[in-house]
C-alpha cells in the first residue's frame, strides 16, 4: 500500500510555487496565455520572444494579475541568442525548472512555392531551435542534479495533412512529437519529464493569420468552432505540475474532436 503521507488523496496539485518557468513565443497567442497561466499558478516566469514591446506588455499583464515575470529577447533561429536567453533567465530567477517550447511560425504555402529562405526559417524556428533549447536546458538541470519538466507544443498536423498548404509546418510538428518521445527516453533516468501538447485549431494570432490566407474552416469542424486558448490551461498545468510525475514521453491531443481517430 502506498504511504498516504507521501501521496495526498487525491494526488493532484497545480501549485507551481518555487518553480521557474520559461515560455518561448510568449509575445502573442498561446504563448502569452501559457506564461500568464504559469505565473497565476505560482511560478516565476520568463517570457521570450523577439518583440521587446510585446514582452514588456506581457510582464505588465502578469504583474497586474499578481504574478512575477521578466521578458527576455530570444531568437529561436540563433543558437547564441537561445543560450544567452537562458543565461538571462537564470540571472533573473535562478535555474529554469520548467520549459515550454511554444515558439513557432507557419508556412501556409504549398511546398513547391516555398523559397529556401522560408524553408530555413520554418525549420530553425519550429524544430532546430526547440531542440537546441531543450538540450541546453537539460544540461543545466543535469549539472545541478535537479528534476525538471519540458512541455513541447506540437499539433494535430503532426499526424494529418490535407494538402492545402503548410506541409513543412506539418513536418516540423511531427519532428517535435518525435523529439518529445526520444528525449523523454534519454532523460528519464535524470528525472526530466518531456511531454507534448498537440492542439487542434485554437484561436491565436498565428492561427487567425492562417485562416485569413487559407479560409475559415471552423464551420466544417464537428463542433463548428475553433478552440479557446483557455481550454489548454488544465493540460498545461497537469504537465508542469507534480500531478504528472509518472508521465513522460506522452503527446496529449487537445483538438475538440477536430481530427479523425
Label the model's feature ranges:
Residues 19, 67-68, 95-96, 141-156, ...:
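Active-site loop of short-chain dehydrogenase/reductase
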Residues 139, 185-189, 245:
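Alpha-helical segment proximal to the catalytic Tyr-Lys
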Residues 134, 172, 180:
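Active-site helix of classical SDR
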Residues 20, 27-28:
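Conserved glycine-rich cofactor-binding loop
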Residues 2-17, 237, 248-261:
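Short C-terminal tail/terminal secondary-structure segment
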Residues 93-94, 131, 225-254, 259:
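C-terminal substrate-recognition "lid" of short-chain dehydrogenase/reductases
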Residues 110-111, 115-123, 217:
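Substrate-binding pocket helix/loop in short-chain dehydrogenase/reductase
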Amino acid at each position: 500500500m502506498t504511504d498516504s503521507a507521501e501521496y495526498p488523496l487525491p494526488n493532484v496539485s497545480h501549485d507551481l510555487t518555487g518553480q521557474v518557468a520559461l515560455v518561448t513565443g510568449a509575445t502573442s497567442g498561446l504563448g502569452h496565455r501559457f506564461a500568464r497561466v504559469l505565473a497565476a499558478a505560482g511560478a516565476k516566469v520568463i517570457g521570450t520572444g523577439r518583440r521587446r514591446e510585446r514582452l514588456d506588455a506581457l510582464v505588465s499583464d502578469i504583474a497586474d494579475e499578481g504574478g512575477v515575470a521578466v521578458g527576455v529577447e530570444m531568437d529561436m533561429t540563433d543558437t547564441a541568442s537561445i543560450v544567452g536567453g537562458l543565461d538571462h533567465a537564470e540571472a533573473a530567477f535562478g535555474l529554469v525548472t520548467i520549459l515550454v517550447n511554444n515558439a513557432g511560425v507557419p508556412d501556409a504555402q504549398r511546398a513547391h512555392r516555398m523559397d529556401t529562405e522560408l524553408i530555413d526559417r520554418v525549420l530553425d524556428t519550429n524544430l532546430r531551435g526547440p531542440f537546441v533549447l531543450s538540450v541546453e536546458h537539460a544540461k543545466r538541470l543535469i549539472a545541478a542534479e535537479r528534476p525538471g519538466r519540458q512541455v513541447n507544443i506540437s499539433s494535430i498536423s503532426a499526424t494529418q495533412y490535407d494538402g492545402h498548404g503548410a506541409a513543412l509546418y506539418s513536418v516540423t510538428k511531427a519532428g517535435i512529437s518525435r523529439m518529445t518521445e526520444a528525449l523523454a527516453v534519454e532523460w528519464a533516468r535524470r528525472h526530466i519529464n518531456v511531454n507534448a501538447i498537440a492542439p487542434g485549431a485554437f484561436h491565436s494570432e498565428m492561427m487567425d493569420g492562417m485562416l485569413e490566407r487559407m479560409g475559415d474552416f471552423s464551420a466544417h469542424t464537428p463542433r463548428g468552432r475553433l478552440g479557446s486558448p483557455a481550454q489548454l490551461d488544465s493540460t498545461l498545468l497537469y504537465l508542469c505540475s507534480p500531478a504528472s510525475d509518472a508521465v513522460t514521453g506522452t503527446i496529449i491531443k487537445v483538438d475538440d474532436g477536430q481530427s479523425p481517430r
